[in-house]
Amino acid sequence: MRWSRYFLYTEKEEPKEAEAPSHRLLLKAGFIKQVSAGIYELLPPAYKVLKKVESIIRKEMDRSGAQELLLTVLNPKELWEETGRWETYGEELFKLKDRNGREYCLGPTHEEEITDLVRRVVRSYRQLPVILYQIQVKFRDEKRPRFGLIRAREFIMKDAYSFDTDDMSAMISYEAMKFAYQRIFNKLRLNVIMAEADVGQIGGKMSHEFIAFTDYGEAKVAYCENCGYAANAEIVPLPKPEEEKEEEKPMEKVHTPNVHTIEELSKFLDVHPSKIMKAVLYIVNEKEPVLVLIRGDREIDENKLEKVLGTDNFRLATDEEVQELLGTKKGFIGIFNLPENIKVLWDNSLYGVKNLVVALNEPDWHYINVNPGRDFQYGEFVDVAEVREGDPCPKCGSPLKVRRGLELGHIFLLGTRYSEPMKAYFTDRDGKEKPIIMGCYGIGVSRILAALVEQYHDDKGIKWPTPVAPFELDIILLNTKDEEMKNVAEKLYLEAEEKGIDVIFDDREESPGFKFADADLVGFPYRIVVGKKVKEGKVEVQSRHTGEKWDVEIEKAIDFVKEKIEEDKK
């Protein structure tokens, strides 16, 4: 491909709306264009990367015994009603009606449709096990689409579904998919950690996520370098601490004027935040007030709280609601003289803490040296604290590491979560009708483009890994008016094509500095610079990844690059 004819136009200005490096660089390098919030066009170079990513995924899925098909984007309401998810999936589900008033959704995932397909086809145990997969566009009405391809409303996903006769067979399918995913991410050259995860809206018995480390991911991973434990931070259990042994001091009421935050209170009273009780009022289902109590040095993990409450329909109480329900202001909510209609949840972190600082439900006043048993009685203990660096590993007790990451893959052992309500049964060897045991396995294909850029970039631009780069080689002609250079560049370009290298020839009539800047920005793995060294019978080969440069004889240049490319793909 000649760059002068290729639909690749870089931007010189920094995209103002972009926060994540992948969002900024994909826009600036001319790989994507935004149509609307969370909706992006993939331009030719991005589409080339996408197709190479899909090829790697297909190869490993086919190798695992999975079979590719293509389901529909439009899913009828009736299928989703069978599982109850038409109502419970939430506002992320795009819903629409046709001209006859029949309701559909744009598939965010395809458990209902694939289960319906299999129940119409599979009758006997002889037809099982089977694993079916597709690479298909999905839609989710994200509340806050952000970071470009990281959190989009329209995206491409690989979703697979396994169907088995029993739990043992289902676990074999699950492990096969787990192994396939590990091979996929290894071949994509992505640094990915497999972590235990919550089953969430999909449901089921077991779940693992495959998370690529990046500062702009929406997931937090806690992992142990000692025993290898890894899990999404929202499911890491934090047990009750041991009861403190210090002597209980007399409770006192102290004046704390204009002190509104834990940090301010800690400084004012000269106490560590861990000695302060923090109280946060939530409104559940727009009617039920729930007061969550937690140690002052901890934060509430609202994903954990969602599981405790059994609903995601909750929010922080407004200033007006705090005043109406408790007669006080935020920052001064305490545990004394609470109305009977207030449900109180105690985070494990408060267990056994002595000489606490507790608000009075009275602005500008606190109690100090408040102690359990003597001054108050505990209520229901729950685990709603965010895990943090240094918390104990639930497996071995060693300090945990915590990093942000981007979920690229998610696998679920579903059991009969969908087959039972949808009556997807088969006749077993004993002649009895039984529900099919299912699993589902997703990979965010378009999101992988963002993850690759997140992990492979520098201050100059993208550094695509060779196996998925839009082009493996960029031949840069420094002077389009120099016939000798031009002839050498043309010869190298044709030779590269003949030898199967995915090559782009920068034949544009631009300055060398302009071409080098573009080459750095778009990030092709190798470049051959055709310049003044041609008179010595040489060209310069450069590696975008390492910055290495080699002066190579013109006749050997393409073979030299081809060898480098083959090494990268091993």
Swiss-Prot record:
Disulfide bonds: none
A GO term from the CC aspect: cytosol
PROSITE patterns, sorted: AA_TRNA_LIGASE_II (PS50862)
Protein name stated in the entry: Proline--tRNA ligase
Domain of life: Bacteria
PANTHER family, per the entry: MITOCHONDRIAL RIBOSOME PROTEIN L39/PROLYL-TRNA LIGASE FAMILY MEMBER (PTHR42753), PROLINE--TRNA LIGASE (PTHR42753:SF2)
HAMAP family to which the protein is assigned, alphabetical: Pro_tRNA_synth_type1 (MF_01569)
Native source organism of the sequence: Aquifex aeolicus (strain VF5)
Gene that produces this protein: proS
Cited Pfam families: HGTP_anticodon, tRNA-synt_2b, tRNA_edit
Job description of the protein: Catalyzes the attachment of proline to tRNA(Pro) in a two-step reaction: proline is first activated by ATP to form Pro-AMP and then transferred to the acceptor end of tRNA(Pro). As ProRS can inadvertently accommodate and process non-cognate amino acids such as alanine and cysteine, to avoid such errors it has two additional distinct editing activities against alanine. One activity is designated as 'pretransfer' editing and involves the tRNA(Pro)-independent hydrolysis of activated Ala-AMP.
Parts forming coiled coils: none
Entry's free-text remark on domains: Consists of three domains: the N-terminal catalytic domain, the editing domain and the C-terminal anticodon-binding domain.
